[in-house]
């Protein structure tokens, strides 16, 4: 999927206006290639980012900034396959996901 450029970073501003990622354990459903993950990862405590597309996850892993690798876990996985223990995540994020 091609994504339109966002030179004014409107998407990131809106994301931070609506959610406080500071110190949170985040579940990102439909992370794709990680394009949105990088925009909040520096504030989150930890992230599990899932997507069913193995190619997108491979791209996300390849493009992941070194300073964020310890806090982001990328998985090739569908949401329906996720085993979510009670209260494991503080926040769930879905973007362009059905």
Provide a role label for each language-model segment:
Residues 5-24:
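Conserved alpha-helix/loop element of class I SAM-dependent methyltransferases that forms part
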Residues 24, 45, 90:
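Conserved acidic residues
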């Amino acid at each position: 999927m091609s994504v339109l450029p966002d030179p004014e970073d409107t998407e990131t501003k809106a994301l931070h206006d609506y959610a406080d990622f500071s110190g949170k354990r985040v579940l990102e459903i439909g992370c794709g290639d990680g394009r949105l993950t990088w925009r909040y990862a520096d504030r989150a405590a930890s992230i599990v980012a899932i997507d069913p597309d193995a190619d997108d996850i491979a791209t996300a892993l390849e493009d992941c900034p070194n300073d964020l690798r310890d806090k982001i876990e990328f998985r090739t996985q569908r949401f329906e396959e996720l085993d979510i223990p009670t209260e494991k995540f503080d926040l769930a994020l879905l973007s362009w996901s059905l």
